[in-house]
């Protein structure tokens, strides 16, 4: 995931759309990339209020499942990952270049993690020709599902692809954090 250990806890609420959070962070400065994490990189937050806020206007208790079972969203919880570049830090006030996408409730256990990434990676002016199978069978073989997956952008920031053509491929490109 590119996420390092937690470098601080968010200590004040922040509304959706805000560009500033309150947290005492270590080892980062203006220009650094971080990830706001609710839950942990490994485990989800199973608090009813947290889950229901993500499902609003619905509630996890309203999810219809087989009698006697608990929905996965309650059993496994939810994880939220928001990636941001720091614009400035002043004391415990951390301002991002872009607004946050979730309302921050300090009581829910939001943490800040360093985000290991690569920047300014680009692919331009190329044509990729595969040899995808004519008769596709979902999960039929490795060739069916990913044999001609050509580009995988992983943990990239400020990166691009332009004037690139793909012919006879099963998956041209993936972008993951």
Predicted region positions:
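Autoprocessing Asn-cyclization modules and mimics
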Residues: 1-81, 89, 95-97, 102-103
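C-terminal effector modules of nucleic-acid-centric enzymes and ribosome-associated factors
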Residues: 64, 71, 83-85, 105-112, ...
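Extended acidic/polar, glycine-enriched regions
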Residues: 75-127, 131-133
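Low-complexity, polar/charged sequence tracts that form flexible coils or short amphipathic helices
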Residues: 78, 115, 143-144, 152-155, ...
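Short glycine/acidic-rich loop motifs that flank beta-strands on beta-rich extracellular proteins
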Residues: 95, 132-139, 149, 169-176
């Amino acid at each position: 995931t590119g996420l390092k250990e937690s470098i601080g806890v968010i200590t004040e609420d922040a509304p959706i759309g805000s560009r500033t959070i309150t947290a005492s962070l270590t080892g980062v400065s203006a220009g650094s990339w971080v990830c706001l994490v609710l839950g942990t990189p490994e485990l989800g937050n199973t608090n009813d209020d947290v889950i229901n806020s993500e499902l609003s206007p619905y509630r996890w208790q309203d999810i219809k499942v087989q009698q006697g079972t608990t929905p996965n969203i309650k059993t496994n919880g939810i994880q939220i990952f928001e990636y941001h570049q720091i614009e400035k830090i002043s004391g415990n006030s951390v301002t991002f270049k872009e607004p946050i996408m979730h309302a921050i409730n300090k009581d829910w256990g939001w943490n800040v993690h360093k985000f290991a990434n690569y920047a300014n990676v680009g692919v331009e002016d190329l044509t990729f020709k595969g040899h995808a199978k004519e008769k596709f069978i979902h999960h039929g073989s490795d060739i069916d599902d990913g044999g001609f997956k050509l580009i995988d952008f992983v943990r990239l920031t400020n990166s691009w692809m332009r004037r690139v053509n793909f012919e006879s491929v099963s998956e041209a490109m993936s972008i993951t954090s």
